[in-house]
Each structure stands twice: as structure tokens, then as C-alpha cells.
A protein has these predicted regions:
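A short, surface-exposed alpha-helical micro-motif characterized by mixed small hydrophobic
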Residues: 217-219
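A short, proline-enriched helix->beta-strand linker immediately N-terminal to the Walker B motif
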Residues: 169-173
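Conserved ABC ATPase "signature" region
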Residues: 74, 126-145, 255
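ABC ATPase NBD coupling module
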Residues: 62, 75-92, 110, 118, ...
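ABC ATPase "signature
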Residues: 232-236
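Short catalytic/signature loops enriched in Gly
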Residues: 5, 141-144, 237-288
Length: 288
């Protein structure tokens, strides 16, 4: 018998309280052990998909229709407390900005250990050992010292490594990585991407990876969903998307990405005429 997808999103619609659509009939799956990228420009709705899965949509947004299933179980069938427990058991988040994600007045060790103890029922001794092990595995030198440090005492790359360690600490089966390299310089970004990929392959964790960078998509994912104004424009294996992109918007995103392998290759921004045409088509859908 075939096992269900780790994550299965079916015709998900999210809107503002005034009815303005944010996500439009989004459907996608993430298989166990798979990395799926969500890519698009700012405002495409990429992060909102991850937040809807985790049940942390911002105030003023609501799911109006559709289903989200984790390991085949519909989350909408569960009461709020049971849903939170289910999500916490299966999924974890790597946020975009480590400086705001980490509590500035608590030591790093406590921020990794306490969730393991309070949410997942670990003993404090086991949780501390797990935290030290993960800090070591994300290539942090002197993890014992870092456990006693505060966030402001670490560099941006070190803080992001801490968040990765924290996300993997409870052995989640799904990780939502919400633009985890956006705030980092290119050199550190490359290290963090390699680190996430290493841990993902080692643990077999499924990853929903949010990014605006097609270069990152090529490096880390097997599947990709291209979004524009909350709608999936193209959904295909990553290799196929780069070899023969089907949608004009996907073609434009690739053309707008600098090539480090071929610096002489020209690139250009996404044409405003294409954006206007796609926006008008989506507006017509809303009117219908």
C-alpha cells in the first residue's frame, strides 16, 4: 500500500477578512524525504502557504476553503488544541530572520532545550544532550559556550545555524523553511543551504522551502511550485522547470536570475507587461 504524502494541500484558499484573495486554489504535495520549493516574487503568497500549514496565519487572514493533510490526516477535522499538537509532532519551522526569531533575553541553550521538554516531553538531560549534538552537527564551534550565549553575541550565520539546529532537534518529519537564507550574505547563504541539505538527506525529513531566488531552487529542491499573486502558475520537477519552463512567468523568473556559471549571459527583470497581463487575468477570475 502506497504511503500518503507527508504534506497534501488541496484547493487551499486564504483571504483577508474583506474577502480579498491571498491564496487561490493552491494544490501541492510534498512526499516523505522530498524538498519542494515555493518560488515567486514578493507578495506571491509563498510564506502564507507555510504559515497556513503550521496554523500561524497572521491576524486578519483566514482559510476560506480547501484542505491541508499531514500524513494523510485532514487538519480541519481536528479541534484547535489537537491540531496544534499534531502539527508540533510532525512539523517545524526555520524562520527567515534569526535575530527576531530568537528571544534576545534568553540563552541559546534554553531556547532549544525548553521546547523539547515542554512540548515533546523529553527529560532535561536528554534535551540538553540533543541540543549539544545538533549544535555540533550544524558546525558550530564550542557548542557548550554557545549554549550559554545570548543571540546578540552570535553572528547572523551562527544565529541561523542555531535555528536550523532547533528545527531539527525534535526529529520532525516536515520542515517549513521560510526564506532561511535571505538575510545572509552569499558566502554564508551557500553554507546554510549545504547544511540544510545535509541534515535533510541524513534524516529523511521532507522540506517545504520558501524562496524568491531561482538559483536557490536549482540548488536545493526536487520539485518546485511557481507562484504569482497567490496562484500556482507552474508545478513540476525542478530539473524540468529549468530545462523547459512551461509558463511565461517561470521563463521570466529564470531570465531575471544572474548566472554564476556564465556571468556573460544577459539577464533582465520580469517584464511589467507580463505582470499586468497576469494580474488582469486573476482579477477577471475574482469577478467571476
Amino acid at each position: 500500500m502506497t504511503s500518503p504524502p507527508m504534506l497534501d494541500i488541496r484547493n487551499l484558499n486564504v483571504a483577508l477578512l474583506n474577502g480579498r484573495p491571498i491564496l487561490r486554489d493552491v494544490s501541492l504535495t510534498v512526499a516523505p524525504g522530498e524538498v519542494r520549493a515555493l518560488v515567486g516574487e514578493s507578495g506571491a503568497g509563498k510564506s502564507m502557504i507555510g504559515k497556513a500549514v503550521l496554523g500561524i496565519l497572521p491576524r486578519g487572514l483566514k482559510v476560506t476553503s480547501g484542505e491541508i493533510l499531514l500524513e494523510g490526516q485532514p487538519l480541519h477535522d481536528l479541534r484547535l488544541a489537537a491540531r496544534r499538537r499534531r502539527v508540533a509532532e510532525i512539523a517545524a519551522l526555520i524562520p527567515q530572520d534569526p535575530l527576531t526569531a530568537l528571544n534576545p533575553v534568553r540563552r541559546i541553550g534554553a531556547q532549544i532545550v525548553d521546547p523539547l521538554v515542554k512540548i515533546h516531553g523529553w527529560t532535561r538531560t536528554a534535551a540538553q544532550a540533543r541540543a549539544l549534538d545538533l549544535l555540533h552537527r550544524v558546525h558550530i564551534r564550542a557548542p557548550e559556550r554557545v549554549m550559554q550565549s545570548y543571540p546578540h553575541e552570535l553572528s547572523g550565520g551562527m544565529r541561523q545555524r542555531v535555528l536550523i539546529a532547533s528545527a531539527f532537534a525534535a526529529s520532525p518529519r516536515l520542515i517549513v523553511a521560510d526564506e532561511p537564507t535571505t538575510a545572509l550574505d552569499v558566502t554564508v547563504q551557500k553554507q546554510i543551504l549545504r547544511l540544510i541539505r545535509e541534515l535533510q538527506q541524513e534524516t529523511g525529513t521532507a522540506v517545504l522551502f520558501v524562496t524568491h531566488d531561482m538559483g536557490v531552487v536549482a540548488k536545493i529542491s526536487q520539485q518546485v511550485s511557481v507562484l504569482f499573486q497567490g496562484k500556482v502558475m507552474e508545478d513540476a520537477p525542478t530539473e524540468a522547470v529549468f530545462d523547459a519552463p512551461d509558463h511565461a512567468y517561470t521563463q521570466a523568473l529564470i531570465a531575471a536570475t544572474p548566472s554564476y556559471a556564465d556571468p556573460a549571459r544577459p539577464f533582465s527583470p520580469v517584464p511589467q507587461s507580463l505582470i499586468a497581463e497576469m494580474s488582469a487575468a486573476l482579477a477577471m477570475e475574482v469577478r467571476r
